[in-house]
């Protein structure tokens, strides 16, 4: 599970892509799950595997990412990796092609649209169930914030309708177990149900929304592994805050879990490797506030006494650090700050970006850079009318 210490650093994306290429080429990894929306990434999955939107090049494909922050996936490094992955796949039989899937929970309305489309083509008698859920959400004009706010004032919600839809789509999809589009529809139903729960809890300021989101991503990993079979091997691309084991940070004190912790707990016997990234200084692509346009921002030298400061003084050059079985050494077992930069970054508040971390328990390996540069976005989008609410911890 190679992760990243920011959502806007060229070296993290570039080297994660190179690392993933080698694992695919040399060790037979068969799918990639990312911190992105399921419907958007399903279009990418079809494209890299040789079906759907084949008239588009990779830049046209990524231009369809519209939800802020678009630069997380619509950037030059992702474009180069996906172009390589498609070329790799098309040289192989259909059954040996590597998939690309979104793990996140945010695509409520897009997922509902995909469910309705699939039911219309495959189970028209079930369309009324989907339309009932759609009509419940209809008054909120595809604005999850309006829906979430309404549940604070009136206890009624769309929970019952969306859960009933999930049960029905699951049942229909099981009848077509080998059908990729049925699996897509079932996963969209899982997204819709969890997204409704996520927004309803988040608007109350409850940090449990973080756990709902990370449980959804871990559950999606499990569903992918089951669907793709026991011989499948998966890579997970997410932020350090999701992949680095929460039990080795102060998140555990606040009752928060994350994907890395859940996958370790569920699949330790199957072989799980959590790989972090870190750097000393450089620049990053991020926004100054939630929902605003991105810009290139400076990343100052690591804070004194942090893990990054220690690595800068001890190494002074890029390195790959693989932690062995004995992790009781003074650095690996020390509680020090570990920098985490999200999609929102304010260098003047740099001290807020350090998470108390026991490095040897949080990761199995760490890729270290002295100097980094900002990602190159493929396009610049104006901010949406109203962006997604921030999660807690913020910015990830």
Please provide the spans of the model-predicted regions.
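Structured catalytic-domain cores with a bias toward divalent-metal coordination
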Residues: 1-396
């Amino acid at each position: 599970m190679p992760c990243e210490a920011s959502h806007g650093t060229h070296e993290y994306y570039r080297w994660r892509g190179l690392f993933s290429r080698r694992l695919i080429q040399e060790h037979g990894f068969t799918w990639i799950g990312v911190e992105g929306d399921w419907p958007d990434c399903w279009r990418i999955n079809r494209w890299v595997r040789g079906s759907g939107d084949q008239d588009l090049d990779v830049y046209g494909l990524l231009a369809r990412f519209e939800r802020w922050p678009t630069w997380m996936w619509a950037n030059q490094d992702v474009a180069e990796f996906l172009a390589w992955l498609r070329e790799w796949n098309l040289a192989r039989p259909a059954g040996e092609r590597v998939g690309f899937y979104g793990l996140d929970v945010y695509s409520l309305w897009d997922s509902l649209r995909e469910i309705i489309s699939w039911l219309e083509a495959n189970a028209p008698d079930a369309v009324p169930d989907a339309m009932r859920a759609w009509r419940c959400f209809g008054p909120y004009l595809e604005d999850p914030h309006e829906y979430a706010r309404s549940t604070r004032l009136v206890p009624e919600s769309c929970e019952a309708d969306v859960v009933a839809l999930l049960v029905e789509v699951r049942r229909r999809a099981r009848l077509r177990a080998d059908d990729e589009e049925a699996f897509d529809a079932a996963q969209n139903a899982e997204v819709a149900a969890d997204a409704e729960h996520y927004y309803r809890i988040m608007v109350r300021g409850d940090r449990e929304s973080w756990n709902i989101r990370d449980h959804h991503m871990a559950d999606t990993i499990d569903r992918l592994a089951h669907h793709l079979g026991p011989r499948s091997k998966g890579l997970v691309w997410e932020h350090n805050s999701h992949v680095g084991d929460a039990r080795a940070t102060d998140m555990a004190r606040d009752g928060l879990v994350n994907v890395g912790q859940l996958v370790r707990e569920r699949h330790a016997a199957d072989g799980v490797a959590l790989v972090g990234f870190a750097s000393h200084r450089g620049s990053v692509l991020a926004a100054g506030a939630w929902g605003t346009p991105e810009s290139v921002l400076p990343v100052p030298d690591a804070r004194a006494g942090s893990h990054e400061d220690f690595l800068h003084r001890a190494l002074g050059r890029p390195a790959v650090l693989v932690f062995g079985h004995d992790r009781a050494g003074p650095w690996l077992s020390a509680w020090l700050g570990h920098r985490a930069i999200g999609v929102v970054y304010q260098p003047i508040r740099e001290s807020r970006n350090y998470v108390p971390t026991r490095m040897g328990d949080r990761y199995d390996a760490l890729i270290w850079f002295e100097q980094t540069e900002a990602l190159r976005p493929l396009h610049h989008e104006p901010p949406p009318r109203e962006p997604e609410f921030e999660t807690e911890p913020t910015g990830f």
